[in-house]
């Protein structure tokens, strides 16, 4: 490395007197190797150790490359690893004892030495001059380590050179293994045997002679089997060889047997054996290793002393160096004495007088070297440094991570809604401390447990348990706060709603304010939530699918909604890993922070149970306990878990960001990870091995010793398998028997599920919050899961392992010597495991106090009710915490909380004063109005003139606010640079208040302090919209307006003052302020003689005037006016401005300004007291203006009045006086008495902070946005974030109640058969199909015969079908109207034909030739398919006859509810029978008539009178106007139409699907020509109307309709004479010149197109009209109300009729309810129209109805966004405006008119 580069010119005569020897030993340390590597790992995270981190990364990379090149049998011996440091872990002990032990230990030694070396030199650096002479040496693999140091020219090269050495060490170990295995194969079943022994024989020659004697005879012993002496020293030798041969040696040789010997830890094979290895061995190792290019080009810079010769290697490059060293390791004998002699010679040669030895652990060789050096040098001149000890000391407690991926993560906020009434973490902790089990019976708001419970498990879809752990009132929600309408809130999953609420509360606790700091930038915040079930969507929402079904129910909208509300632009993830979802989501959030994707995460888990299916399914899977208990974790009778609700949210940041942001840290995440139990016996079964592996992995990532963990929160569900497996994993990792915990280091374990049950997707979040509370409370709560005896499967040696299950509340205090560490386990039923390592939060000490005595405190809310609640909560908090710091409270309420529009603000100096003001606000809360409803007010700055301040000021802002002080100092530097004296003595308090400064200093101090004060207001976000300056204050005003620069301002003020001093006589003139109007002064001084002449200097108000003049004149006029009763006050000024005293300077001053100053166009209006007007242009303010302003009158009255006339200012303008005292604000209040707010920046005799705080409180109350963080920034390190009470929600219940027990049946036939018995829900009226089938008949339309009675020619058959059955639904889907699948009359026809064909042979067996005629079909109500395909939609058709031959069959169609309710018929028909041959004969005469009309139409086409349509054109027009047919229905190939007459060429599809008697698409294809004419002909007004058919007189087919066959259809529709909008016609179907079918008297009726949606809309899940069970009013869709909205009061929509009644549709019936919306009479005046039938009144009622709002909420200033009218609802309302009000608007309506008032005015203007 560069710091060690030897001086090339140094020799024996060098002045250097020091030699440094770096000795790399060949032994790993005897103490805890894992601890050394763990500390190096921790150091590598520090930004101060980049080279160490890179070396570890590079070494890991090369090892992975080398391992991938190994043979499969060797490669599989090495487990997967993330970093080479893992090889040192106890878990990898078998690796170090295995077949590859030599390679593994060699790598570990090199990595430890080089990593320690790098770390050491990143901590300390040598003085280059002291380290000119360096010698490197080592033993064994240590010698290889030295090569990296020798070759690296600079420190930055060492990681790459070191990685290459790691590669060679590994390859060397593998090579030696391969050779040694040939010498003697290892017994892998036992422990490895040593290949080398240290033998205490001093005479190495005698030892060699003994060996020669034993192995000298080549015939009796193979050369490769002989024992060699691999190392010699003065007192001993090392004998090496195959282990069995070594044992034989000690048995056979008396010399060796009698000598003391020790087996060395050399298990990898034989080295230092020239008889085994040749030069090619070393060369092959080096050549096979892919050396880094950088290393390959390096040359050795430091000498490495050979352990055989004692001389430095003679190598010219890296390859030669490596070959020399490896060859020596393989072939050469170690002669340590030679090394010692070589270093002695180096000392003698260099003349060194001192030696320093760096080493990596004590050894005999090191001792020999030390003794030798001390024999040459003076003992005191030899020093030894253990680099290993120095570099591996514990790292600093808090490191600075070198990247985000190495940061610790801080949890800074949390909030919850948990069972047992735990609506906050305090209540949660109370449950834990008291050891409560909060399980209870399933509450009624979820489902009726009485009907859904079966302890036997025999009844389908029922739960075998009645119990769970539930949140109280999960429907409570503050919808307006989150900008949600009641409709949206009701439809939104409570999991999402409560996630929003707890996210807000967690962020509130975290002191979050968006964009306050770098880590809170909105673009850098992400949301991560775990959710594993959709109960509310599946059951509650699913009963009435509405606009918000998708955004209110789909999981992605949960975190997405949080991002949207808070305007986070980072990622949002909804994560499902079953029971580990919550903690897995937090782990993903951690990864986002570590990967630098985000800077703040809001994460957690949610679970609200409303679906009984979940209980039933888990019971059937044997997951759940049946008892009235939460989870019986570790109990001998544990039989499953208890389900639980829960919502938990946390806010997480990187630790360094949290500390920089002054956050309260609840706990620190050191590591987190997730894996999968891949080798478990089943997917739901846990696996101890994988759990333990994950624990070790996460601990490694965190740099934590498992024995340092003192608490583990287990998953602990209370299942036999899960508890046992998890306990095994815990014991193996945290409380092993092999490396036991000390007596003072116990491990405690617990499981929160014993208290709260298993929250499934929120379980891990709950467990994490528990541990955070334990950190805070310094206690471990009792475990209550063991109800009786502990599970016998759990090992009995827990006490022996020092592992404890706390049965009582136990202390867990902070320790001074180490931090408390905890682990949270969370496992998923799908096999996922998540583990997190936590550390207690650091203690923050505040040494300095905030110097401010007065502080701004505010309480705010979005509504008045919440404001009252927030004030009350704060008062209660202060009563409970009397020592609360006002400074901290101000910081928390102003800089660290959201500021809402309903607010109160105050600036108390004492806690007593604060509580008094808070109580006063509660008493007058009705006087409080929301701030900023119409936007922030206009702000005006007014700048004070001279004479208002003390002669010497002492500004607290200058002392306390660095930015203010810096700005003043910059201005002062400019002033001094322009030749003026420093003005700081006039403001810093260094002189008494009455100390008189020069005019230059005084005037510069005033103007510069005003500029600095303005800059301070700017820094707080308060910028003026208009400015005005009084006299000298005009200069500061012009600067702030951008007219002149700060430099020019200082120049003009300073030069003018200098001119005054130079050219005007001090004391010759004076000024007086008179409490009189200008007119009064003139009247009372009109007789004054000429010697008493004076000038009107300032007109400050109606009765405030300032006069200037000579001293005598002012004395005289003052006397006169005082005698007249007017108060006169002489001003303490050096010169009389605005008088003739200034005349001598005017010309020169103007010339100077013209020559030196640049005037710019103002950036804001400037109110000019000189001109009495508002200046906007860039020409008025110039050199002449400042000349005139010096001499002429200041007319404040005219200036303000004219500004008001121009609307530049108004009574709502907020005035801030920028100056040393409140002067101008008093003028403004007198001139403009309607002004609401005029505030000072400073007061002459008051503390700066009191004045500023009072003004800020008033500004805040008025709605001015203030950068509160900037206000507190100079003092933030002295302030704490308080954990104040959470927001007081204005909650109401929004809930869709699950009704009935349809989850039990779901329309499945098996329920009726399998569920029969006691308590079965099945009955004879069940809508089940299969349960009651009495026939084998099954077609696509007639799916099940549920009743059949045949008696001669009399009979009844009842069929039942499910419209959702695929074939039937597809048939309906092929006939779409108004984007709904509608059952076409051809489907009814197929049903009729099928029943006729089924019954005829049963009732009249001899009627084989007869075919059916469907007569008098009348459909009174269309059958429209549900949108929800998952719910059955049943209908039945009954066919009855008393005499089939003479009376035919009577058919009725009826809808059937899922509970078996049968409705009134919606269609009827009659079937008769006839002979088709007779039909053909009777139709024959009509053929020529029909054919002639077809020919006539063809002719009309030819002359352009009639229209011809292609297939595509016809069906495209049909779809546009009414019916969108699917492909198989589109049989018309071409159409000719003229008026109401037309014919079509038809070809039926040849693609068959379904089981039909007469396929509906065939019937439609040949018959819907009539419908085409009625909805596409130019003879019909199809724009405003549409036509539908209620049926026909008769339909019959003499021949079957054949797939692929061609036909012709003809029809002429005739309007009826009564002008009722009814049309009749006969459709003829022809084939090959014959009429083969006919639809007689097909009828169409005309209806307004506006009613299309009303009559063709998908119904709810059960179509309800008047039923045959009982006579009840037809229920209709209820109007939702603001408060508790439930499905009970909102039945599904009626199935709309296909044929509307002739009279107008009846209005919707509104249900009677005690909490219905307020009537119009109760609405505010703004919503009351003189005529309630006006468009605007109707529009407001429509909006209120659609959003489920009360009319009283629709006040003029209410914003649609605040009311929850989002883009989706906007589209719905806009569409209803068009349909119901004929108001044509777009979806952007509520963006164009954002408030109720805006919309109402627009409607009244255009639609009145």
Swiss-Prot record:
Residues 1343-1494 are annotated as: N-terminal hotdog fold. Residues 941-1265 are annotated as: Malonyl-CoA:ACP transacylase (MAT) domain. Residues 31-272 are annotated as: N-terminal acylcarrier protein transacylase domain (SAT). Residues 406-840 form the Ketosynthase family 3 (KS3) domain. The keyword Phosphoprotein applies. Induction: Expression correlates with the formation of the sclerotia and thus the pigment production and is directly regulated by the cluster-specific activator CPUR_05433. Pfam families: Acyl_transf_1, CurL-like_PKS_C, ketoacyl-synt, Ketoacyl-synt_C, PP-binding, SAT. One of its GO terms (biological process) is secondary metabolite biosynthetic process. This is Non-reducing polyketide synthase CPUR_05437. It catalyses: holo-[ACP] + 8 malonyl-CoA + 8 H(+) = atrochrysone carboxyl-[ACP] + 8 CO2 + 8 CoA + 2 H2O. Keywords: Multifunctional enzyme, Phosphopantetheine, Phosphoprotein, Transferase. Disruption phenotype: Leads to the loss of ergot sclerotia pigmentation via blocking the production of red pigments endocrocin and clavorubin, and of the yellow secalonic acids. Does not affect the ability to infect plants. Non-reducing polyketide synthase; part of the ergochrome gene cluster responsible for the typical purple-black color of the ergot sclerotia. The ergochrome gene cluster produces several ergot pigments including the yellow ergochrome secalonic acid and its derivatives, as well as the red anthraquinones endocrocin and clavorubin. The pathway begins with the synthesis of atrochrysone thioester by the polyketide synthase (PKS) CPUR_05437. The atrochrysone carboxyl ACP thioesterase CPUR_05436 then breaks the thioester bond and releases the atrochrysone carboxylic acid from CPUR_05437. One of its GO terms (molecular function) is 3-oxoacyl-[acyl-carrier-protein] synthase activity. Residues 1659-1676, 1713-1727 have a biased composition (Low complexity). Pathway: Pigment biosynthesis. It is an enzyme of class 2 (transferase). The active site is at residues 579, 715, 758, 1375, 1564. Its EC number is 2.3.1.-. It comes from Claviceps purpurea (strain 20.1) (Ergot fungus). Residues 1659-1727 are annotated as: Disordered. InterPro entries: Ac_transferase_dom_sf, ACP-like_sf, Acyl_transferase_dom, Acyl_Trfase/lysoPLipase, Ketoacyl_synth_AS, Ketoacyl_synth_C, Ketoacyl_synth_N, Malonyl_transacylase_ACP-bd. It comes from the Eukaryota.
């Amino acid at each position: 490395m560069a710091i060690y580069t030897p001086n090339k010119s140094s020799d024996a005569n060098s002045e250097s007197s020091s030699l440094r020897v770096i000795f790399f030993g060949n032994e790993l340390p005897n103490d805890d190797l894992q601890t050394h590597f763990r500390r190096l790992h921790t150091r590598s995270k520090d930004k101060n150790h980049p080279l160490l981190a890179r070396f570890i990364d590079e070494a890991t990379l090369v090892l992975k490359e080398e391992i991938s090149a190994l043979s499969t049998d060797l490669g599989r011996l090495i487990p997967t690893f993330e970093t080479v440091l893992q090889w040192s872990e106890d878990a990898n002990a078998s690796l170090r004892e295995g077949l590859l032990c030599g390679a593994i230990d060699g790598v570990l030694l090199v990595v430890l030495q080089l990593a320690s070396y790098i770390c050491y030199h990143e901590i300390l650096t040598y003085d280059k001059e002291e380290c000119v002479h360096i010698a490197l040496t080592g033993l064994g693999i240590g010698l290889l380590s030295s090569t990296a140091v020798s070759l690296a020219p600079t420190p930055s090269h060492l990681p790459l050179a070191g990685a290459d050495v790691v590669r060679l060490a590994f390859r060397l170990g593998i090579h030696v293994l391969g050779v040694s295995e040939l010498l003697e194969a290892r017994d892998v079943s036992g422990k490895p045997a040593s290949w080398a022994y240290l033998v205490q024989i001093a005479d190495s020659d005698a030892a060699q002679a003994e060996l020669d004697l034993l192995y000298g005879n080549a015939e009796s012993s193979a050369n490769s089997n002989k024992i060699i002496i691999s190392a010699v020293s003065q007192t001993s030798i090392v004998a090496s060889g195959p282990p069995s041969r070594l044992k034989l040696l000690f048995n056979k040789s008396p010399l060796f047997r009698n000598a003391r010997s020790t087996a060395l830890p050399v298990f990898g094979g034989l080295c230092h054996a020239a008889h085994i290895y040749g030069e090619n061995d070393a060369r092959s190792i080096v050549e096979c290793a892919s050396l880094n290019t950088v290393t390959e080009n390096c040359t050795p810079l430091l000498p490495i002393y050979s352990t055989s010769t004692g001389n430095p290697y003679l190598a010219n490059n890296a390859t030669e160096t490596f070959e020399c060293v490896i060859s020596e390791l393989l072939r050469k004998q170690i002669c340590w004495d030679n090394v010692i002699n070589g270093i002695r010679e180096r000392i003698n040669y260099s003349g060194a007088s001192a030696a320093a030895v760096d080493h990596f652990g004590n050894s005999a060789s090191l001792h020999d070297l030390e003794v030798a050096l001390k024999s040459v040098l003076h003992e005191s001149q030899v020093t030894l440094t253990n680099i290993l000890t120095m570099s591996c000391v514990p790292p600093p407690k808090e490191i600075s991570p070198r990247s985000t991926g190495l940061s610790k993560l801080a949890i800074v906020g949390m909030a919850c809604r948990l069972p047992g009434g735990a609506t906050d973490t305090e209540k949660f902790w109370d449950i834990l401390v008291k050891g409560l089990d909060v399980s209870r019976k399933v509450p009624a708001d979820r489902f009726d447990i009485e009907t859904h419970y079966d302890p036997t498990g025999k009844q389908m879809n029922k739960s075998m348990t009645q119990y769970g752990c539930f949140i109280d009132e999960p429907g409570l929600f503050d919808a307006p706060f989150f900008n949600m309408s009641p409709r949206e809130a009701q439809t939104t999953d409570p999991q999402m709603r409560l996630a929003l609420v707890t996210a807000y509360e967690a962020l509130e606790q975290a002191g979050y304010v968006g964009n306050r700091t770098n880590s809170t930038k909105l673009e850098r915040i992400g949301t991560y939530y775990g959710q594993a079930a959709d109960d509310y969507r599946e059951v509650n929402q699913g009963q009435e699918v509405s606009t918000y079904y998708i955004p209110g129910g789909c999981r992605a909208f949960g975190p997405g909604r949080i991002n949207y509300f808070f305007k986070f632009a980072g990622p949002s993830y909804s994560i499902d890993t079953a029971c580990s979802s919550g903690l897995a989501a937090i782990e993903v959030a951690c990864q986002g922070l570590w990967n630098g994707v985000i800077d703040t995460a809001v994460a957690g888990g949610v679970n609200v149970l409303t679906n009984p299916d979940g209980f039933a399914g888990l019971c059937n899977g044997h997951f759940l306990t049946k008892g009235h208990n939460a989870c019986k974790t570790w109990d001998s009778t544990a039989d499953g878990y208890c389900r639980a609700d829960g919502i938990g949210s946390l806010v997480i940041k990187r630790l360094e960001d949290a500390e920089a942001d002054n956050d309260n840290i609840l706990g620190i995440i050191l590591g987190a990870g997730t894996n999968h139990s891949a080798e478990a016996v089943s997917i739901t079964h846990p696996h101890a091995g994988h759990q333990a592996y994950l624990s070790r992995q996460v601990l490694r990532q965190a740099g934590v010793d498992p024995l340092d963990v003192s608490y583990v929160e287990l998953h602990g569900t209370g299942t036999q398998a899960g508890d046992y497996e998890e306990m095994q994993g815990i014991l193996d990792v945290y409380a092993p028997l092999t490396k036991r915990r000390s007596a003072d280091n116990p491990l405690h374990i617990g499981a929160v599920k014993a208290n709260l049950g298993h929250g499934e997707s929120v379980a891990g979040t709950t467990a994490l919050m528990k541990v955070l509370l334990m950190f805070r409370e310094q206690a471990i709560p009792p475990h209550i899961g063991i109800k009786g005896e502990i599970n016998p499967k759990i090992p009995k040696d827990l006490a022996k392992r020092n592992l404890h299950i706390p049965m009582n509340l136990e202390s867990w205090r902070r320790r001074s010597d180490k931090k408390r560490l905890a682990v949270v386990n969370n496992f998923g039923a799908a096999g996922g495991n998540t583990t997190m390592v936590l550390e207690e939060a650091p203690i923050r000490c505040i040494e300095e106090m905030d110097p401010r005595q007065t502080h701004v405190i505010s309480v705010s809310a979005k509504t008045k009710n919440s404001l009252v609640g927030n004030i009350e909560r704060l008062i209660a908090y202060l009563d409970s915490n009397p020592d609360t710091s006002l400074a901290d409270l101000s910081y928390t309420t102003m800089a660290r909380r959201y500021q809402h529009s309903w607010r109160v603000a105050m600036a108390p100096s004492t806690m007593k004063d604060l509580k008094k003001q808070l109580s006063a606000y509660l008493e007058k809360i009705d006087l409080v109005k929301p701030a900023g409803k119409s936007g922030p007010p206009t702000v005006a700055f007014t700048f004070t003139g001279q004479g208002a301040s003390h002669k010497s000021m002492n500004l607290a802002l200058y002392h306390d606010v660095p930015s203010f002080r810096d700005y003043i100092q910059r201005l002062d530097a400019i002033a001094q640079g322009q030749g003026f004296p420093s003005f700081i003595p006039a403001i810093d308090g260094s002189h008494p208040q009455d100390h008189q400064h020069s005019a230059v200093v005084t005037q510069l101090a005033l103007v510069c302090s005003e500029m600095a004060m303005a800059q301070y207001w700017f820094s707080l976000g308060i910028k003026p919209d208009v400015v005005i300056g009084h006299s000298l204050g005009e200069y500061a005003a012009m600067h702030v307006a951008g007219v002149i620069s700060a430099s020019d301002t200082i120049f003009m003020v300073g030069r003018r003052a200098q001119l005054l001093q130079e050219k005007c006589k001090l004391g010759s003139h004076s000024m007086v302020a008179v409490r009189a109007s200008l007119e009064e002064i003139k009247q009372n001084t009109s007789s004054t003689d000429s010697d008493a002449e004076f000038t009107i200097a300032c007109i400050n108000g109606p009765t405030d005037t300032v006069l200037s003049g000579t001293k005598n004149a002012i004395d005289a006029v003052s006397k006169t006016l005082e005698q007249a009763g007017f108060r006169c006050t002489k001003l303490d000024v050096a010169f009389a401005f605005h008088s003739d005293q200034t005349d001598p300077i005017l010309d020169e001053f103007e010339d100077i300004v013209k020559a030196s100053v640049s005037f710019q166009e103002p950036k804001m209006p400037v109110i000019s007291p000189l001109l009495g007007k508002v200046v906007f242009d860039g020409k008025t303010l110039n050199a002449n203006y400042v000349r005139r302003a010096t001499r002429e009158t200041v007319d404040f009255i005219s200036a303000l009045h004219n500004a008001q006339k121009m609307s530049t200012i108004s009574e709502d303008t907020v005035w801030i006086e920028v100056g040393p005292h409140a002067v101008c604000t008093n003028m403004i209040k007198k001139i403009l008495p309607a002004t609401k707010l005029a505030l000072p920046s400073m007061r002459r005799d008051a503390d700066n902070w009191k004045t500023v705080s009072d003004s800020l409180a008033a500004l805040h109350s008025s709605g001015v946005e203030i950068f509160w963080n900037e206000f507190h920034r100079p003092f933030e390190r002295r302030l704490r974030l308080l954990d104040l009470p959470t927001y007081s929600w204005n909650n109401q219940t929004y809930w869709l109640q699950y009704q009935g027990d349809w989850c039990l049946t779901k329309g499945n036939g098996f329920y009726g058969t399998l569920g029969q018995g006691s308590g079965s829900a099945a009955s004879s009226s069940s809508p089940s199909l299969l349960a009651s089938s009495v026939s084998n008949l099954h077609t696509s339309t007639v799916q099940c015969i549920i009743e059949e009675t045949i008696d001669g020619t009399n009979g009844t058959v009842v069929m039942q079908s499910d419209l959702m059955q695929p074939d039937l639904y597809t048939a309906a889907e092929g006939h779409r109207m108004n984007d709904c699948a509608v059952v076409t009359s051809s489907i009814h026809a197929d049903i009729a034909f099928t029943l006729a064909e089924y019954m005829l042979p049963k009732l009249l067996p001899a009627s084989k030739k007869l075919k059916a005629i469907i007569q008098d079909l009348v459909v009174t109500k269309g059958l429209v398919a549900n949108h929800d395909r998952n719910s059955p939609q049943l209908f039945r058709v009954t066919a009855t006859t008393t005499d089939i031959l003479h009376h035919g069959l009577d058919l009725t169609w009826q809808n059937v509810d899922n509970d078996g309710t049968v409705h009134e018929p919606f269609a009827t028909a009659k079937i008769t029978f006839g002979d088709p041959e007779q039909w053909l004969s009777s139709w024959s005469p009509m053929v020529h008539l029909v054919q002639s009309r077809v020919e006539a139409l063809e002719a009309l086409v030819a002359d352009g009178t009639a229209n011809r349509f292609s297939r595509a054109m016809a069906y495209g027009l049909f779809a546009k106007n009414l019916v969108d047919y699917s492909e198989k229905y589109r049989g018309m190939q071409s159409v000719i139409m003229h008026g109401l007459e037309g014919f079509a060429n038809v070809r039926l599809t040849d693609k068959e699907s379904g089981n039909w008697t007469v396929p509906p698409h065939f019937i439609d294809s040949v018959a819907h020509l009539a419908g085409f004419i009625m909805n596409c002909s130019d003879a019909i007004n199809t724009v405003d109307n549409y036509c539908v058919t209620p049926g026909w007189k008769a339909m019959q087919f003499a021949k079957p309709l054949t797939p692929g066959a061609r036909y012709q259809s003809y029809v002429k529709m005739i309007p009826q004479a009564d002008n009722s909008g009814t049309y009749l016609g006969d459709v003829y179907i022809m084939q090959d010149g014959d009429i083969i079918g006919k639809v007689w008297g097909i009828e169409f009726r005309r209806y307004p197109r506006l009613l299309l949606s009303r009559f063709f809309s998908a119904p709810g899940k059960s179509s309800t009209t008047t039923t045959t069970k009982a006579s009840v009013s037809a229920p209709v869709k209820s109007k939702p109300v603001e408060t508790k909205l439930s499905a009970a009061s909102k039945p599904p929509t009626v199935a709309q009729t296909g044929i509307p009644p002739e009279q107008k549709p009846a209005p919707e019936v509104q249900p009677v309810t005690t909490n219905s919306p307020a009537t119009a009479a109760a609405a505010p005046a703004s919503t009351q129209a003189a005529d309630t039938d006006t468009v605007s009144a109707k529009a407001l009622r429509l909006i209120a109805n659609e959003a489920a709002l009360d009319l009283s909420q629709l006040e003029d200033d209410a914003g649609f966004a605040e009311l929850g009218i989002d883009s989706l609802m906007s589209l719905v309302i806009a569409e209803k405006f068009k349909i119901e009000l004929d108001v044509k608007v777009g979806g952007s309506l509520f963006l164009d008119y954002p408030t109720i008032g805006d919309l109402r005015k627009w409607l009244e203007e255009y639609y009145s």
